[in-house]
UniProtKB/Swiss-Prot annotation:
Native organism: Arabidopsis thaliana
Gene Ontology molecular function, alphabetical: cysteine-type deubiquitinase activity
Classification lineage: Eukaryota, Viridiplantae, Streptophyta, Embryophyta, Tracheophyta
Broad class of the protein's primary localization: nucleus
Gene Ontology cellular component annotations, sorted alphabetically: nucleus
Chain ranges passing through the membrane: none
Protein name: Ataxin-3 homolog
Amino acid sequence: MERTSNGGMLYHEVQESNLCAVHCVNTVLQGPFFSEFDLAAVAADLDGKERQVMLEGAAVGGFAPGDFLAEESHNVSLGGDFSIQVLQKALEVWDLQVIPLNCPDAEPAQIDPELESAFICHLHDHWFCIRKVNGEWYNFDSLLAAPQHLSKFYLSAFLDSLKGAGWSIFIVKGNFPQECPMSSSSEASNSFGQWLSPEDAERIRKNTSSGSSARNKRSNDNVNQQRRNQALSREEVQAFSEMEDDDLKAAIAASLLDASAAEANLGAVGTSEKETEKQK
């Protein structure tokens, strides 16, 4: 049976700027172990090693060293997004290994993800972690106000939906830290980390969902009212068009009637004139 860690509490970080990679690493470790400066240092170290390899290759291939020194970092973007290599190196400090879910070594996890302890998910510039804590699975996406509990059945469905949407998924393997002293964690959390009981996390999510539902209801009501107005406008236009058609038909009929009457009157006048001439 898995031992309860951190007194049964969940560690969650809410999105701050573009620091989702930092949030992802810390929620994998379940504690504020890394800051953005720590990951930036890891990225700089990787950049230095990569440039050294490129310089050595330049000497063999006849390229100028300046061709590579001007290269931008491939491990951290100007917006603060870190590469998977940075996350891998950071987790290696804790003797954890990161491997792609679609590689042959990960076949058991593909069949039964419940066997694992953590997944890292990445799409475009966003990272988040799915983690088993005290025997229960949670989605620690930093865009969420609190961790989202995932049932064992829903875990597989959720991972499949992410893969179908184009997300890259990695497994984290190794011996995860069991305890993170909360006294020191509050100092290192940079104000975006929080410890929550599973009950508190559920309560926060329900309150957030209720607020979102109310906003969505108001938005939907507005959309529905706009649609009703548009439908009413279309009906009015159609009725007006039909009215115009009826009026046009009536006007044409009246015009034809007037023309017939005029012709009849004209014919009567002509006949009367002829009879007058005969009498003369």
